[in-house]
Amino acid sequence: MAGSHPYFNLPDSTHPSPPSGPPSLRWHQRCQPSDATNGLLVALLGGGLPAGFVGPLSRMAYQASNLPSLELLICRCLFHLPIALLLKLCGDPLLGPPDIRGRACFCALLNVLSIGCAYSAVQVVPTGNAATVLKGSSTVCSAVLTLCLESQGLSGYDWCGLLGSILGLIIIVGPGLWTLQEGTMGVYTALGYVQAFLGGLALSLGLLVYRSLHFPSFLPTVAFLSGLVGLLGSVPGLFVLHTPVLPSDLLSWSCVGAVGILTLVSFTCVGYAVTKAHPALVCAVLHSEVVVALILQYYMLPETVAPSDIMGAGVVLGNITIIPAWNLSCERTGKVEE
């Protein structure tokens, strides 16, 4: 990191600082966020906010053209394939180094399973609730798995922000779980919630496997493999399960294109963030996706937003603010003491 380089600790002999005040360079060091805080901010702005548009846009494409989740997954995977050109230009193998190629493919498979579960859930469950269950389960599973497998714990304030954010998610999704309809519709809705939970579990496992990959081009390699594995698994099923469906109007094509671009941006930002910060904290910051999805659900879709949704969204926003703010304040305090 730039702030720890010896050059930044040398006194400036050409422009001496006044004896009564601290050097301006020390002030710059004091205010410079660490890699972990940068990762959390990237996850918040580049990962959570764009991902919040994906659920509503997917629902709009489904309502306009009856576009199933399998076709939407294939369209998204197509946006990952051009990354092969970047890998070729850099001279890197498309599938990664031979010794860790299996882990990279397994990570890509987990990503595809998470995406497929999310797209299936959003077609039978309100978009905000589907995002809530997926992000909540990914956060809890990431915290438990990282603690058990990597022995990497969290501070008290991190736990406070994480658990408070999960409380907000429970406030959002709780009333809907208690009022499931009886009969076939209720079964489909319950299965949608189960798919969202499994998607969060697959996401947390994928993040842990991703953190174990150590080679220069691991981010573009996993992104390309996610598209390749998704296509290899989805295209055969497309002709077995049902007749292929294409978007029927400009709105559907626009939604599909926007979903592909936004998910690729979100994937890249989350992939960067999880190498800098604790996976559970990254997943907690990604709860901002839920707030964005609820706002778009209210303004763009014929789906009501209950008072509990608004209350839970406020709790989520307050708690995901605690995590990067506390990390940044700790860094500043530590640098002042130095």
Swiss-Prot record:
SUPFAM superfamilies: Multidrug resistance efflux transporter EmrE. Residues 1-28 are annotated as: Disordered. InterPro entries: EamA_dom (IPR000620). The chain crosses the membrane at residues 37-57, 67-87, 105-125, 160-180, 190-210, 221-241, 250-270, 281-301, 310-330. Signal peptide: none annotated. Its main location: membrane. The keyword Transmembrane helix applies. The gene encoding this protein appears to have arisen by SVA-mediated retrotransposition of the SLC35G6 gene in the primate lineage. Belongs to the SLC35G solute transporter family. PANTHER family: ACYL-MALONYL CONDENSING ENZYME-RELATED, SOLUTE CARRIER FAMILY 35 MEMBER G5-RELATED. This is Solute carrier family 35 member G5. It comes from Gorilla gorilla gorilla.
